[in-house]
Regions:
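Short acidic (Asp/Glu) and glycine-rich catalytic loops that position anionic groups and cofactors
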Residues: 1, 23-29, 66-68, 98-99, ...
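Non-catalytic, polymerase-adjacent accessory regions of viral genome-replication enzymes
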Residues: 1-46, 341-342
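Short alpha-helical scaffolding segments that buttress acidic/His motifs in well-ordered protein cores
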Residues: 20-24, 88, 164-169
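Active-site substrate-recognition loop segments, prototypically the cytochrome P450 B′-helix/B-C loop
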Residues: 26-108
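Conserved polymerase palm-domain catalytic core
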Residues: 44, 50-52, 60, 70, ...
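Right-hand nucleic-acid polymerase module
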Residues: 78, 87, 171, 227-231, ...
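Acidic (Asp/Glu) carboxylate-rich active-site/surface patches
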Residues: 112-113
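A common structural junction motif
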Residues: 237-246
Length: 342
């Protein structure tokens, strides 16, 4: 594949930075740091353009916080100028990142996403009698910068641009020099998604294997027999160790497709997709909060209806009508909020 030439001047062009600024600010205009940047947008973008061309970007500042839903993760939020920089870069190179990936990779891609990944898993379970499911142990902290940069150099050229990517990696080395990507930045998402493309292609090259699905570091593929499943798993484990410096989590699964799989928070069966335990618990908690606010008079009926509409997003993409009715019955309701009485 011919490498794409990228210049710092292309990234720093004013229309590109304006578009990047709009993307980075979308939904965050009320944030103080974003509001300050936007209030002085012309000078801020001029300064960012100069920093890009003069090879002083990125700024490198980031705030760090921890979330616990669905599991403990350390999130690094880049300063707003760096978020604009990341969008400016991927305005230019996202199309090439798309061509790097197989069609069965679903994270951080337009027209893909979790729900399409879950439907692809269901199709795999319907077609193949066995499946393998694995995920990478400590994926983001384990990514080696030298291997990632080698991959990027095979796809892009331009000394200034590649040096910019290296500086971004250096600023986000979360596991010591030369290792780790920060969770929470646009660049990290694209880098991490591309880093496992070789593993995708390794799986798809195996005989008796198909129905491959990957959402970031959560992989599932179908197999014609248990023997093929075991062989493909052993091969992938060796490939990740030798070519990527990664290892799989101890909990890897080989099972008959008729047993179904849990994937991205859903319980996927050959004939139905159901919410997983965390999604159900999150929905129950949301309904309890809405009911408490309504009973105490803290929220109007319209506020409660809007909150209810938001809580339904937790269960989108799966068959959840029966579960919702059971939860609501526990609060004395026979109909969902907003439904007509007949």
């Amino acid at each position: 594949m011919k490498r794409q030439a990228v210049t710092l001047e292309a990234i720093a062009e004013r229309p590109n930075l304006e578009l990047a600024c709009w993307k980075a600010a979308r939904g965050r205009q009320s944030c103080p740091a974003v509001a300050r940047f936007l209030a002085d947008r012309t000078q801020q973008l001029d300064a960012l353009a100069a920093a890009i061309v003069d090879e002083r970007a990125p700024d490198g500042r980031a705030s760090r916080f921890v979330i616990h839903d669905p599991k403990r993760r350390v999130i690094h939020a880049a300063c707003f100028a760096d978020r604009v920089l990341h969008h400016a870069i991927f305005n230019v190179v996202e199309a090439r990142f798309e061509t790097m990936l197989v069609d069965s990779s679903f994270a951080c891609r337009p027209g893909k996403g979790v729900h399409r990944a879950v439907l692809a898993v269901q199709r795999s379970l319907q077609r193949w009698p066995w499946f393998v499911q694995v995920d990478v142990d400590g994926y983001f902290p384990s990514i080696r910068h030298d291997l990632l940069m080698a991959l990027l150099r095979r796809r892009f050229k331009g000394a200034g641009f590649l040096a910019l990517l290296q500086r971004i990696l250096d600023c986000g080395a979360t596991a010591g020099p030369g290792r780790g990507l920060p969770i929470g930045t646009l660049a990290s998402q694209h880098f991490a998604n591309a880093f496992l493309d070789g593993a995708d292609r390794f799986i798809l090259d195996q005989a008796g294997v198909g129905g491959h699905v990957r959402y970031m570091d959560d992989l599932l593929w179908g197999c014609e027999s248990r023997a093929v499943a075991e062989a493909s798993l052993a091969g992938l484990e060796a490939f990740l160790r030798d070519a990527c410096g990664l290892r799989l989590k101890p909990r890897r699964r080989i099972a008959r497709s008729s047993e179904g799989a849990r994937y991205c928070g859903f319980r996927v069966r050959q004939g139905v997709v159901l919410p997983g335990p965390r999604k159900m618990a999150r929905f129950r908690a949301a309904v309890a909060r809405i009911e408490a606010a309504r009973t105490a008079g803290w929220a109007s009926e319209a506020d409660c209806q809007r909150a209810w509409d938001g809580s339904l997003a937790t269960l989108s993409g799966c068959d959840s009508g029966g579960f919702r009715r059971r939860v609501l019955a526990g609060f004395g309701y026979s109909l969902e909020p907003g439904c007509p009485s007949n």
